[in-house]
Each structure stands twice: as C-alpha cells, then as structure tokens.
Amino acid sequence: MGADLYIRKLFDPQMKKYKRQIQIAVQKRDSALLSSDKDKAQKEVDRLYNIMYSKGYWRDPYNKYEVLDKMKFSYWVDFPCLTKNVKGRRMMSPENAKMLACLLEKRNMNLRGFNAEEKEYFKKGKNELIQFLNSASKLKQSIECSI
C-alpha cells in the first residue's frame, strides 16, 4: 500500500503505449516452461513496467520508507488541505503542487536511525517528489492523488 500520484497528461500516454506490451510479456513469462526462460521473460516485464511508470507517476509507500513522513508531512492530514474532490478523485491543483514543492525544498528530513544507503534513498525520493510536483506546476496540470 502507498500513495500513488499521477500527472495524467504524462502518465496516460505511457500506460497506453506499454500496457499491451506488458500483457504480452506476462503471457510469455507465464507460458515459459524453463525457469531460465521465465526469469528472462520476467526481466522484460520489469523493464517495460519501469518504463511505463517512468513519467507522470510518483509512489510513496506507507511504511518506514515513506518519504513525505520524513519531512513531517502526512497524506492523511496535509493532503486533504491541498486537494479537492473532483468527480470522485482527489486532485491537487498546479498551484498547490508548486506550493508543496517550495515547502518541501525548505524542509529538513528526520533521518536519525537510518544507515547511509537508506539516507540516500530518502534524499533521492525527496528530490524526485519535488521534481514531480514542479513538473505538474510547469505543465499546469493537476495531480491525481490516490491516497
């Protein structure tokens, strides 16, 4: 489980382009008889999946690796103030995305108790989230927030 954020203008074309290719790769994997063929096919599924989710999508898990939490923000407390319900979807305006990006840029992360590799994960995640929010702002696109 986690928070899934989408910039539909970027994500939907990726989904449309790669969904069928992934389905074919999954069928190939599932019909493979040898474990080496299954492994090879799974690598192709993973590769296509990573490409499909490489644009217009950001995910934050609901566990100790939640990036937003390390900056003392909450999907349940703060996001309702930054989003509104539009036809059953939680949407964040481009203006609120820019505001949140600015707030996050200034926030320090509480990374006490994490090792160097984990700290790097959080720093990278923070930068990716800020870039994601700024992309929505620059494109003047709302963010769909599945939280």
Regions found by a protein language model. Give the residues of each.
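Acidic (Asp/Glu-rich) sequence patches and key acidic residues
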Residues: M1-I147
